Amino acid sequence: MKTKRWFVDVTDELSTNDPQIAQAAALLRENEVVAFPTETVYGLGANAKNTDAVKKIYEAKGRPSDNPLIVHIADISQLEDLTGPAPEKAKTLMKRFWPGALTLILPCKPDALSPRVTAGLETVAIRMPDHPLALALIRESGLPIAAPSANLSGKPSPTKAEHVAHDLDGRIAGIVDGGPTGIGVESTVLSCADDIPVLLRPGGITKEQIEAVIGPIHVDKGLSDQNEKPISPGMKYTHYAPTAPLAICEGSPERIQHLIQEYQQGGRRVGVLTTEEKAGVYSADYVKSCGRRAQLETVAAGLYDALRSFDENKVDFIIAESFPDTGVGLAIMNRLMKAAGGRVIR
């Protein structure tokens, strides 16, 4: 398959009349898959109502079939066809954070979507992205768009169109290149099924921001039973991982430097994931800063690009610094723990 690529100059006034967006939307209506930017990461979109289209997402990514997909909409009016009545707290969150990096788990209307989208569950993960290109594409298609991250399953999510092309060129119909994404980590996923909502995946909207609007929420610590069906994307399987094994070190820079030397003595090429403040401290074979520790939003924005760079530099082992698990740091540490497969050095 030849993957078509469009380059779109993104502005807030981006029109659905843009001929490149029209071409991409036409492919979506033909039940093909198209990658496009959102404010979080690039998504791999398909018609959420058509099972054949959704199947192509799973095939292109190599994604397990019990991992549900997030449905993207461009207007609140689309909810009426897809979900049952939303709880009041969900409505409050929509008013405050949509469009934005917040995905809500809501009851799904019977037969409203392909069962491949919900992985057989009675709920659906749904959000409205805060990106002019994404919104224009969804509106032009006239469809709800199922879209996980546009990467091979298990690999770091794409924040640039080049990342998408690296993983999926020849496997999908098209890539809409709208430049790098802003937030850099996926949306926050919140289940509103209970009286007290449950945070299933930390992301671009922080726990603190949500609680400032609706009061206390619970935090899901992750599924302990791997045979359970996940109700949200990103709750199961290793994610976001470069090729080389990665471990998080919660120790001091001196401890990390000692580990570097220890692994190098074994003949391994060692990489370190750090921040601008400490990039000059380590004598590893490859040192990569993903942002400023004093401004964790920059770390989130640069995280996946940094993880991908370790593959390009062919390291054998990666040591990552740890971060505070508050604010957007909770999302950063969630992604690093997934990438590390839970490996932590203290």
From Swiss-Prot:
Keywords: ATP-binding, Cytoplasm, Nucleotide-binding, Nucleotidyltransferase, Transferase, tRNA processing. It is an enzyme of class 2 (transferase). One of its GO terms (cellular component) is cytoplasm. GO terms for biological process: regulation of translational fidelity; tRNA threonylcarbamoyladenosine modification. This is Threonylcarbamoyl-AMP synthase. InterPro entries: DHBP_synth_RibB-like_a/b_dom, Sua5-like_dom, Sua5/YwlC_C, Sua5_C, T(6)A37_SUA5, TC-AMP_synthase_SUA5. The keyword Cytoplasm applies. Required for the formation of a threonylcarbamoyl group on adenosine at position 37 (t(6)A37) in tRNAs that read codons beginning with adenine. Catalyzes the conversion of L-threonine, HCO(3)(-)/CO(2) and ATP to give threonylcarbamoyl-AMP (TC-AMP) as the acyladenylate intermediate, with the release of diphosphate. Is also able to catalyze the reverse reaction in vitro, i.e. the formation of ATP from TC-AMP and PPi. Belongs to the SUA5 family. GO terms for molecular function: ATP binding; double-stranded RNA binding; L-threonylcarbamoyladenylate synthase; nucleotidyltransferase activity; tRNA binding. It catalyses: L-threonine + hydrogencarbonate + ATP = L-threonylcarbamoyladenylate + diphosphate + H2O. PANTHER family: SUA5, THREONYLCARBAMOYL-AMP SYNTHASE. Its EC number is 2.7.7.87. L-threonine binds at T40, H72, R127, A147, S187. The keyword Nucleotidyltransferase applies. Gene3D superfamilies: DHBP synthase, Threonylcarbamoyl-AMP synthase, C-terminal domain.
